[in-house]
Amino acid sequence: DFQEKNENRPVIPVYIGIHTFHDTESRTTVIYDWRAPISSMFYDHELGEASYQSPSGEINGEISLKRQYRIQAGKMEFMIESALTVHDDILQKELSANADDKMKNIVATIQREQNRIIRNEEARTLIIQGVAGSGKTSIALHRIAYLLYTFQGSLSSNDILIISPNKVFADYISNVLPELGEETVPETSMEQILSEVLNHKYKYFSFFEQVNELLTKPTPDFIKRIEYKSSFDFIASLDRFILYIENHYFRAEDVKLTKHITVPAEFIEEQFPRFNRYPMRQRFEAMTDYILDMMKVQYAFTVTTAERNFLKKEIKRMFAGNNDLQVYKDFFAWMGKPELFKMRKNRILEYADIAPLAYLHIALKGGTKNYVKHLLVDEMQDYSPIQYKVMQKLFPCRKTVLGDTSQSVNPYGSSTADMIQKALIMGEIMKLCKSYRSTCEITEFAQQIRTNTELEPVARHGKKPQVLQFDNEKEELSAIKNLIVTHQASAYKSLGIVCKTETQACEMAEKLQIPDIHFLSNQSSAFVQGIVITSAHMAKGLEFDEVIIPQVDDKNYHSEIDRSMLYVAVTRAMHRLTLTYSGTKHTPFI
């Protein structure tokens, strides 16, 4: 109930829901969309003085009552009335519920700090650093829904593009926008973007394959190559080399156009910098037209189409930068570091080379995608600075970038919020520090693996995580089977068995031989509810009522990337967490 700061104004009940409901006869709004300006007061204010920004300016007044209802299938499930705890009570109900096979909308439980992110219209680039379980992906999708509502007419679903880590995650989040009354937004991956820029010319290791190699057989040289190509020094060198190409890769020659007319090399040479407003490979057309126009003026000479095409072909031949891969190889030779470029068997490129190769291609050929008006980038920590440079060149639009530095599965090529801000040259950083997903006990356990001093757990308690030791693998496997049986008899809906690698997950699925276990691989395209066995990499962004992490011995989890994987696996659990290992020593991370 809200009363404007005006003695003559009555107290009005303001009903808020997922959608607007308008009474056409009385011409009044019965229910306001949660995104409407007046609705912001519910999320931002308690009882007492309150205000909101309307199209005509700030409206001040007082909230005298806050209630929250849940109505399902025409029946009221509950109604809570309270000065302070409306959100807390509803939030506790939601957090205690079971995980679903699809991410849900959180309109009923949006918190104040989340609402500020959702309704931020000023930031051209908004970078959200959110701890594990802070709801950052959900908040970002609600932000997209808010922007579509606020800027309807100038922004549509087709104007937005989501870069998501994999198809499973894209499927998992696919229900949120339709639930909020918006159409599904186009979705892609970093690999798809880079492949399209390079016209699908090159075979390369995927990001998943790079991570897998780092987990199973990393070499110091491989790590060194990834680290260097993820540095700002590398970007600076690449930019200097692009300038070098501009000044040294075009070598003009005389062109004999007809028996009597030769275009001198000096004249052709002068035209290359004249058209520097175009990317280098786009200049040949303009140079050809300009040269022929000058000849027409000077010699009253008109060329045939064949002669024009011949001149253009000759000018293109004078430029030594027409082959992306050769230019990229030249770059390492120019730096005096040829060892930092390595092609694998069958001319397969390393994943760390694809973004810089695309960056070079854009510098030489161009390729801005102006049809995208807002770019949403999830799992921001797993993209390197050079990948952000590619995004910046391809998509010169508004951006929402989100992730958690603590959850990187790419430790040698990851980005912090500050690094992303530097790469994109601009960006407002906002933080989500409250963790809602896991119980306090699970959160405390995760903090032992990787401490995040900014993380604030929401007070919800449960059982302490268990670390179970066994004499051999057979006993460990038998115990995991028993844990699955216990889960099936419980009220929990979802169980994630999260292994370090996909190979280990596949082997575990074969050994368990239990019906209705879903194996989630990097080739999967949908997330299913029930019992899922997968790798930590694929589990990122997902959540389960209960999580089992097998093989947490000191041989399996010992490196920094192993620590990252273990942290990701542990933070998938909402209510119950069990870790198992066989042998004498568990990982030093727990």
Task: Please identify what each model-predicted range represents.
Residues 153-154, 158, 167-183, 188-195, ...:
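Conserved helicase motor core of SF1/SF2 NTP-dependent helicases
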Residues 108-120:
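Pre-Walker A adenine-sensing motif
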Residues 133:
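Walker A (P-loop) phosphate-binding loop of P-loop NTPases
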Residues 128-130:
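Hydrophobic anchor at the beta1->P-loop junction of P-loop NTPases
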Residues 1-93:
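N-terminal accessory nucleic-acid engagement/regulatory domains that precede
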Residues 136-137:
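Conserved lysine of the Walker
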Residues 148-376, 382-390, 398:
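Alpha-helical nucleic-acid-binding subdomain
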Residues 122-126:
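Pre-Walker A (Motif I) flank of P-loop NTPase domains
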